[in-house]
């Protein structure tokens, strides 16, 4: 297996006002003054909190990302943020394609593709999310479903380095439910994603692209997950809102 740097990414979702974000950022900076070799740490707060977190989390080795972006550079797009805006606030990553964006805001694969291309062109790293519903899982077509999401969402993406994109597999039935796909389940789909990336970008690039697992990832299961050959970290929801839990995941991933 290629030597890929693990990525533990926290998605705060719509949690923490500015004061709460400052407190959590302070706690994370104190808990993670350094991180284990071979592990990278990322937090993605709500847009309103990005500048606060950026200022408070330094000099801890924690990267900053956003939870959403719009593909146009500027203009009459009320409520949206551009890639350059996110960069100017200190972001280096951005989550796209999360099931909550797809389900609640009716975002399509085409939307994710536009976002991915805009982010890469701006020098930001898209964390492209994909995953199946319980209905698709029970129908047995989940691998095909996820592979099709990857093909559509990353079609035509021009990358020259594997660190220019991250893929996060999040089975929808495991997000915020306490249910977790087994490490074997995660490996099955993450492995299929890797094979798809090889078809799209060639073996050398695909072997370096990080594929994360998300969906009730927590301190108790992170070590088992990242032990699998095609699971390169986690996109963490609820556990990322508690500094002690998130820091514990980072440490355990690096053991």
Question: Where are these predicted regions, by residue range?
Answer:
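Active-site loop-to-helix "anion-binding N-cap" substructures in soluble metabolic enzymes
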Residues: 1-255
